[in-house]
A protein has these predicted regions:
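PP2C/PPM-type serine/threonine phosphatase catalytic domain
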Residues: 1-265
Length: 265
């Protein structure tokens, strides 16, 4: 079994966080799930899919499995890891990467036991805040943004057919993108394949930064500039989360909407 990477010094910068989720105005069920775990300094959004409530099951399983893996590691750092660690990654990055793989294993095992859920899956985006760096892992089109000063920067690149189209044809207009028939089809998710390879990003931790972790029900309805304005002008994170949800619903609320905000320092 693989060994555990060595842990670093204790974290010093405090965090504040909140998370809200809403079914939106055009869906009866909410298949999004989120977790805001201050003790583990872990923040997750998952957007389920699969029908027959399977999407809701998959998204909740993903959040629970990843948080449980973090909690288990911190309780016993010497235990064997269930997947191979990457010696080039930090502890935080390995925890996220392996935790996402564990979540994928659990979703696939559950799907095999219930034929009604054999097509269930979920996107995932997870943010882990360490002592000196922030690590993001994701699969699918749920996103992580970072507000630093006046700049709201998207830190994740969607795993979706439309994102691949935009990369191949950067001249595509907003109208062409909106009319693209497969714009909601993701190319990477939990549950769809035996192995999942989450995209990883690591950046230095800076006090004053605010991170937004969200499902496509938010970013697909609310322009980045409007999201930035809400976060910058609303210091109270609970109020800012509610305003983000409200903005998506005011734009028609075509999908489930989830937003988690995390302030550093």
């Amino acid at each position: 079994m693989p060994g555990s990477p060595a842990s670093g010094p204790a974290t010093t910068l405090p965090l504040a966080a909140c998370g809200f989720s809403h079914a939106g105005r055009q869906r009866e069920e909410n298949e999004d799930a989120f977790g805001s775990f201050l003790d583990e300094r872990l923040f997750i959004v998952a957007d389920g899919m699969g029908g027959h409530n399977a999407g809701e099951v998959a998204s909740v399983m993903a959040v629970d499995a990843l948080e449980t893996f973090f909690r288990s590691y911190h309780a016993d750092p010497r235990q064997p890891w269930p997947h191979q660690v990457d010696s080039e990654l930090s502890l935080g990055a390995n925890l996220l990467r392996v935790g996402v793989k564990v979540a994928n294993d659990k979703i696939r095992a559950a799907a095999k036991q219930d034929r009604a859920k054999n097509r269930m899956g979920t996107t995932i985006v997870a943010l882990a805040v360490g002592d000196a760096q922030v690590t993001v892992a994701h699969a699918g089109d749920s996103r992580c943004y970072r507000l630093r000063g006046d700049e709201l920067k998207r830190l994740t690149r969607d795993h979706s057919i439309v994102e691949e189209m935009i990369a191949a044809r950067p001249e595509m207009t907003d109208a062409e993108i909106a009319a693209f028939a497969h714009r909601n089809v993701v190319t990477r998710s939990l549950g769809s394949k035996e192995e999942v390879d989450p995209a990883m990003l690591v950046e230095p931790l800076e006090g004053g930064d605010v991170y937004l972790v969200c499902s496509d029900g938010l970013w697909g309805s609310v322009p980045d500039e409007k999201m930035k304005g809400i976060i910058r002008s609303t210091p109270d994170l609970d109020a800012a989360c509610q305003l983000l949800i409200d903005a998506a619903n005011e734009a028609g609320g075509p999908d489930n909407i989830t937003a988690v905000l995390v302030r550093v320092g």
